[in-house]
Amino acid sequence: MEVINSNQIGVSFKGSGSYVPHQILTNHEISKKVDTSDEWIKSRTGISQRRISGLSENVSEMGYKAGLAAIEMAKWDIETIDLIILATSTPHDLFGSAPEIQSKLGANNAVAFDLTAACSGFLFAVITATQFLKAGSYRRAIVIGSDQLSSYVDWNDRRSCILFGDGAGALAIEATNEFDNLIGFSMRTDGQRGSFLNLPSQKNNDQIIDNINFSSGGFSTIAMNGQEVYKFAVREVPLIIDNLFKKTNFNSEKINWLLLHQANQRILDSVGDRLNISSEKILSNLSNYGNTSAATIPLMLDEAIRNKKIKENDIIATSGFGAGLSWGAALIRWG
């Protein structure tokens, strides 16, 4: 544990939570709609099923339930929460869904806002929250990753509809003068490769009056160049984690767990191989939930903590990566 000077501020990770919808969509059921099979999907992605939000479920509701579970694990009074950051690319309200979660929680003293960085979103939000805490601005923060990608999937495209699901996860973080359990982090973006994975707007051109033009509409469906995204992930993710190891004087042998964005089992295995991290250290629940974007990391984290796989003071190397293109890594000590 890294002990800090009394005039410095570190962070401690106090609780986790998660929520997934009750509707389960299996590979077999998808194969009734598009030309695919359970064996084909599992062999290429590692996914067996995914959760799909019901008509009454949305990002705010899922995020609220995950956040509440994290608060309960941390044993916090709701009134003591200062900051809520929601990582999402599929907000229930385009102007922001975090305030709705704040209201549902009754966290009246907290400022709440959304952060959009797709599948890197939760990691970026955790890093953002810790900087507020370490600066002394706030004491307690809830970071939530919640996404409802099923609303933006082309369910007739067998290349992409097999990948995505819905869910939410959360983390309770607290400032402390005793130690710092955020050992190090790094974040990157490359907009030049943004077209490899995006969700473009779908606009209709119109006029208010003559010569005053405008466009209206919403969004299309997820567009992805799977081959390029795979090459990006298996190259950049090991590099950013390895550079973080060097910066923090860590290595693959010193970590207990590798927690990656749950995008594709082949990516998880390839990153582990390139970092010389044994498969026993790679956390994965991809088979049950698929790619839930900003929710994948906290979903897996909460599952591993509640199953007592991750224990106090375990070292976790984690990385989020995806649309933007964006990617990042962090080394954390649980507790």
Swiss-Prot record:
Pathway: Lipid metabolism; fatty acid biosynthesis
Major localization class: cytoplasm
Keyword hit for Cytoplasm: yes
Substrates-to-products reaction catalysed: malonyl-[ACP] + acetyl-CoA + H(+) = 3-oxobutanoyl-[ACP] + CO2 + CoA
Assigned EC number: 2.3.1.180
Alphabetical keyword list: Acyltransferase, Cytoplasm, Fatty acid biosynthesis, Fatty acid metabolism, Lipid biosynthesis, Lipid metabolism, Multifunctional enzyme, Transferase
Gene3D superfamilies with a match to the protein in the record: 3.40.47.10
Enzyme class (EC, first level): transferase
Pfam families: ACP_syn_III, ACP_syn_III_C
Subunit structure, interactors included: Homodimer.
Record-stated family: Belongs to the thiolase-like superfamily. FabH family.
Protein's name in the database: Beta-ketoacyl-[acyl-carrier-protein] synthase III
Organism field: Prochlorococcus marinus (strain MIT 9515)
Organism phylogeny: Bacteria, Bacillati, Cyanobacteriota, Cyanophyceae, Synechococcales
